[in-house]
């Protein structure tokens, strides 16, 4: 398969919302390769929302939200094979791994979108780790009283990147994922309601609320 490269810095957009941070190359290529083998062995099933079956497949640990009853139902605990990733995220943020109460692994087949939403209120801060394929996250104010395309911020998510949504970015904004061009996986880690995570320390490959927020994604083969 041809290698796909993306240019993430060819357009300047408004700053990211407060509480939103993205870092590139959170995982090394070797870590990504090993983690993909772990993810592909998980028992995925189709995501469902109020009777609708989505194209996205998921594996949920530490609870599964039932959208028909709006309740959090039990699900298996996180498998030990995901502990190295959880621990790496915890070190990045300077927190104890036990603060992550929920892990959701999602598989996006080519062309799979994720609609506008805020994450369920049972959880607080969100950390996402991106693998294999690139994606575009869109963010807009919540509630969107008079939604316009010009009000949407677009954030390119390259493979091996990680992002944080906490505080205002978590509660005052919605996000969605544009239809993906290639197979991708994401691992989302969440804390319990009321347990807000700190932002990670600044680094050279990090986009922060006061800096560049989005880019057009160009694929070159």
Locate predicted features:
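Non-heme Fe(II) oxygenase metal-center motifs and adjacent flexible, charged/small-residue loops
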Residues: 1-221
């Amino acid at each position: 398969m041809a290698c796909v490269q993306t240019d993430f810095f060819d357009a300047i957009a408004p700053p990211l919302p407060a509480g939103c941070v993205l870092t590139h190359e959170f995982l090394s290529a070797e870590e990504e390769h090993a983690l993909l083998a772990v993810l592909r062995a998980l028992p995925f099933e189709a995501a469902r929302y109020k009777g609708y079956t989505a194209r996205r497949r998921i594996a949920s640990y530490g609870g599964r939200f039932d959208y028909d009853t709006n309740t959090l139902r039990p699900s298996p605990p996180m498998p030990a094979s995901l502990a190295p990733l959880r621990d790496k995220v915890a070190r990045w943020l300077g927190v104890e791994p036990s603060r992550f109460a929920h892990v959701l692994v999602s598989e996006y087949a080519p062309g799979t979108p994720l609609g506008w939403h805020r994450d369920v209120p049972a959880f607080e801060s969100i950390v996402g780790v991106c693998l294999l394929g690139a994606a575009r996250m869109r963010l807009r104010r919540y509630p969107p009283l008079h939604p316009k395309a010009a009000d949407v911020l677009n954030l390119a998510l390259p493979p091996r990147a990680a992002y944080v949504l906490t505080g205002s970015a978590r509660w005052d904004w919605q996000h969605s994922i544009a239809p993906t061009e290639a197979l991708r996986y994401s691992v989302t880690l969440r804390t319990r309601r009321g347990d807000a995570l700190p932002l990670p320390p600044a680094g050279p490959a990090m986009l922060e609320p006061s800096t560049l927020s989005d880019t057009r994604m160009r694929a070159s083969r």
